[in-house]
Amino acid sequence: MFKPVVKSRSSRSFCYLAGCLAMVAATLSSTAQAKSEWACPEGFTPKAGLNTDFPSDGKKRAFVVVPPKDSAGGAPVWVPMVGTVEATNWNLNVPRSGNNAKLAEHGYMVISPVRQCAEQDPNLGAGACNGVGKDGWTWNPWNDGRAPDASGDKYKTDAGDDVRFLEAMVRCVGTKWKLDRKRLFLGGISAGGTMTNRALLFDSEFWAGGMPISGEWYSTKDDGSTVPFQETRKMVAAAPAKIWQGRVGPYPLPSKLDPMVVITVWGGEKDLWDCGPPLGLCSDYRPTTQASSNYFSSISNVVHVACSATHGHMWPQVNTDAFNLWALNTMASHPKGSSPKDFKLTAPPEGYSCKIGRFTDHYK
């Protein structure tokens, strides 16, 4: 005969206590997880202004912090990056070079990394940063694209030092200032734009989006092999809607990314780069921005905005401050995890033409 089991008072008390302990454990776990979002290397404390000797991948790195003014709650983050020939401090404070520190006046936490080749000097322009890369990398300022020979094969799957440094830098700054975890953005011009592409491709779990300005894609054939520069231009021009593999990211390119918003900027007909003798003209940002826009637009949970202008191969020159603020507010309007169908594109400042999706003005 079945007899119901009647729990004693002590057993009921134990179950109640166990339930309470489970709830406490869950709360503590959640709190610990929130705290673990922000962490510094042991003994390092971030500060406003220039931070040096930040340990990352066995190296000492530097970055500049410009805290937000009058930011309510967690501040959205903007990480601007220079290219080959301009200094970090120019990018922060000189209108021609970006004037990005001004965004702190609008509530953004601005964190500007110093290139490894600059040896922690935020005032170094070209110098040692202007040249061909080494140790498996294509170009010198950032570890942004793998070399076309066997030395670069490792970086088909390894993100590289700079991708890890950028994330570690932001996580450390978050230990001192309250940051908005769903609004972490980065961007850059030229090699800085290429570095933006690489970070978004390898680390989409961390970033909410970015703005590559005239960045490289280092387009390749489907098998990942490289063709000469002039042939690459013809290759993309012959199939401008194709998804091109690129040495900027993993090989093969990921079929999925975490939700993000990406604004790709093309500087128009004069958006070219001459590497000087003996190389000469070595990059055309028409095919590179076309290829990047094709890829990001093909990922269902990524919002891609294609912007064209006429400033050439520079940080956007027309209404610079207004464009920067428009771009950051556009990205901030789409925090990480937002549905692409809810995204609304507002009109950019005068001098820019922007649309959702891939570029359709590059090739007629």
Curated annotation (Swiss-Prot):
Stated role: Catalyzes the hydrolysis of 4,6-nonanedione, a beta-diketone compound. Also mediates hydrolysis of oxidized polyvinyl alcohol (PVA) in the second step in the degradation of polyvinyl alcohol. Not active toward the monoketone structure.
Domain of life: Bacteria
Protein species of origin: Sphingopyxis sp. (strain 113P3)
InterPro entries from the UniProt entry: AB_hydrolase_fold (IPR029058), Plant_Biomass_Hydrol_Est (IPR050955)
GO molecular function list: beta-diketone hydrolase activity
Enzyme Commission designation: 3.7.1.7
Cell compartments where the protein resides: Periplasm
Enzyme kind, highest EC tier: hydrolase
Recorded GO CC terms: periplasmic space
Reactions catalysed: nonane-4,6-dione + H2O = pentan-2-one + butanoate + H(+)
Name of the featured protein: Oxidized polyvinyl alcohol hydrolase
Signal peptide: 1-34
Keywords annotated in UniProt: Hydrolase, Periplasm, Signal
Lineage start: Bacteria, Pseudomonadati, Pseudomonadota, Alphaproteobacteria, Sphingomonadales
Gene name, Swiss-Prot/TrEMBL: oph
Annotated thermal dependence: Optimum temperature is 37 degrees Celsius.
SUPFAM superfamilies to which the protein is assigned, alphabetical: alpha/beta-Hydrolases
Gene3D superfamilies, per database record: alpha/beta hydrolase (3.40.50.1820)
Cytoplasm listed as a keyword: no
Subunit field text: Monomer.
Disulfide bonds: none
pH dependence: Optimum pH is 8.0.
